[in-house]
Amino acid sequence: MAQVVGKLREEATPGEHLVLDRLRTNLPKDMTVYVETPISLYRKISNPDFIILTNYGYIILEVKDWRNFKANKHNALVQSTKGEIRHANPVTQARDYALDLSNAIRKTAEKIKVPCPKVPYGFAVVFPFVPAYHKKTLQDVWGETSVLFEDDLSSHMVNHSIKNTIREDMISPITKKTMELVRGTIYPETVTSDGVLLDEEQSKLVLETSVEEVAKPAEQPLPKAPKPTPQALFAEEVKPEPWNDLPLEGEKIISGNSVRLVRGVMGSGKTLVLLGKAKHWSKMFPDWKILVLAFNKEIAQLLKKELRGNPTIRTTHLDQLLREIITTENKYLWIYPLDARSWVRNHEDQYEIIQNLGCDFVADELSWIQEVMVSSREEYLAVKRVGRGNRIQISRKQRDEIYDLLEEHYREMEKKRQISWELLYLKFLEWVDSGELNPPKFDAILIDEAQDFAPSWIAVVNKLLKPGGNLFMVDDPTQSIFRYFTWRQRGVEVVGRTRYLKLPYRNTREIYTAAQAIIKDDPQLISQLESEGEEFLSGEDLTSMRSGEKPLLIVAKQQGSDVDFIEAQVQHLKRKQGINYENMCVILPVHREVARFEKSLSKYGVKVITSNRVKGLTFDVVFFCGLETFFVNGNPDDAAYSSNQKRIIYSCMGRAKQFLYLMHQNKISSYFEGLREHVDLYEL
């Protein structure tokens, strides 16, 4: 459901009421419809019926209730009770309004002394009551994309219809600052400097104001800011708790720190909130050193782009930061860390425990031991092992053998002067505690995709925080594609400090519902959430989401036919939908397949990426290939494995904003039976 600004005048026509209703209901939430908003340009005032602001430009719509009329390139003769009345070509009128707004945007940019960007625009006239058999004739006279009819405003057509009014060579995404400039031209008081567009709930999370912040006069130069207490930062919503009432695990991180967790469903704007919070703190406390941490380098690059121009904010991913700290301190010559999974596979023939439990199971167990910072064999034998489900249990003897493997792994690495990713975090903590490393300290650290940060990672983050520093995190447990840890396991007390974003806006309703079908009944996920006193967030009001086409589940009978299909489809989508190639993506489950797809698709600029690297990225079109490879390598009794596979699939499906293609070789696996009612099937 689109945001609507303004209202129709009392004497508005039935057609104008009908069009507004269709736009409000069928356009997505991230579009804004301005109703009868005057455009002021020098001494001229234009009054278009509707202005639609999107993330790829603006569209002017004029509405005509005409039913019987004749048209040529310049005029229309409209039948009325008073006879024929001549009207100027309304398409020309809509075009003039679009040009007026373009010039007004340039004038606004000059006034506030910023460069004037190119803003794509379109225009059209809507004829809600023209009989269907007249459509072709009218389109021939005034242009196919310049005239719209009632069916063009239906839920499955409206996005394509309005986008099609913009010339294909003009279409390109516009920045948030540009959108703010356009908003500020229409309503001058809405011009802002940071360019972040948030809905009401997101804005509350970003702009929660501390006691110290209220006291600062905005027009005065900002003095060196005193560090706010944890209680002050969240005084509006959280009653201060005595720190000695916190459990021991919470005190490890919480003591002296303000902790904030924003938990949201897929596509609810969690990252927008994080970006807004980082900019807000940077602006209010200019002497703070702020660190924004991403899960991987792809997300870090996107966040860095959004936060450029903020010199007090450092944006990176944790692996890169540790590498810089360690090599700067000359701890040792950097050797790219080993993958424990590869080490286990290389030793499968030597150890019966690997053969019995499987490589993936044993590798996950070795990682878990290190990530929860188990420090001895005795502790591992005694610790309660959670996260594996009830159908598979590890005996004490098997634990003993697994710990033997871990010690052998350590011995081999020490002999070869190597290190694993898991051990790197433990060594970092050891070196900091011993004084061998002196890492930089930050006043505030913000973590995106925090659900994938293991306890050892969070312990490292704590070492990077100044005493009394502030920790702000956003997460979604349903997208935890590695191991799941509760925040209590990670030493972070978030009870009473968690806020929720329940409204998804990124995907179409059809894509979101299909993705939800994969995980909504996952017993492992439900159990894990219940252990935190949480429940599964399924999205609040899906009726407000924009509608689109169902995902297409393609069953390929021949090996290799997937590449040919995708190449033909990306050309079709570019030609018919106007979607740029860089807004399309192919997701693969394994890296060895990347080269085969890139050979055919690299010339278009279509991104080809693996499922473990696509987290946090979004595209208009996603081709998710290789579904048949899921659920085949692990132990079917391993609840953690099955849940992990479902979350990977769910997260990858959620990367698609408009069109989603799911590709499966041969017969559809039983794991995907629940998808059938949410997709259209196609045999290739």
What feature does the model see in each segment?
Residues 1-48, 52-203, 208, 212-216:
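Intrinsically disordered, low-complexity Ser/Thr/Pro/Gly-rich regulatory segments
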Residues 155-266, 272-284:
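Pre-Walker A segment
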Residues 223-224, 228-245, 251-252, 260-336, ...:
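Conserved helicase motor core of SF1/SF2 NTP-dependent helicases
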Residues 55, 63-98, 118, 136-147, ...:
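Conserved P-loop NTPase-based nucleic-acid remodeling module centered on helicase motor cores
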Residues 37, 65, 125-129, 317-319, ...:
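A general secondary-structure junction signal
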Residues 122, 129, 334-420:
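Coupling/switch/interface segments within P-loop NTPase motor domains and analogous charged loops
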Residues 11-16, 89-97, 198-201, 270, ...:
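Phosphate/oxyanion-binding active-site loops and adjacent basic polyanion-contact surfaces
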